[in-house]
Amino acid sequence: MAHKKAGGSTRNGRDSEAKRLGVKMYGGQAIKAGNIIVRQRGTQFHAGYGVGMGKDHTLFAKVEGVVKFEVKGAFGRRYVSVVAA
């Protein structure tokens, strides 16, 4: 009789769901208060004028205007601001 031995198990076989991180609104785009600008882990981008930061480091617009990205300071930090259109 033909037989096939039972296959072994592996410790792989799972994968986490993508978190959809990244820049959601780019420089020069019009934005409304409350809209998300960047979803991130840690502060890759820092909050500038008119921008708030959530507890998961998400940057969002506090005022209506246009998104502006800039590099400031001796450490070359990247800031996101919302300026009036």
From Swiss-Prot:
Taxonomy, superkingdom: Bacteria
Signal peptide: none
GO cellular component: cytosolic large ribosomal subunit
Aminoacyl-tRNA synthetase is among the record's keywords: no
SUPFAM superfamilies, A to Z: Ribosomal L27 protein-like
Membership in a protein family: Belongs to the bacterial ribosomal protein bL27 family.
UniProt-recorded name of the protein: Large ribosomal subunit protein bL27
Gene name per UniProt: rpmA
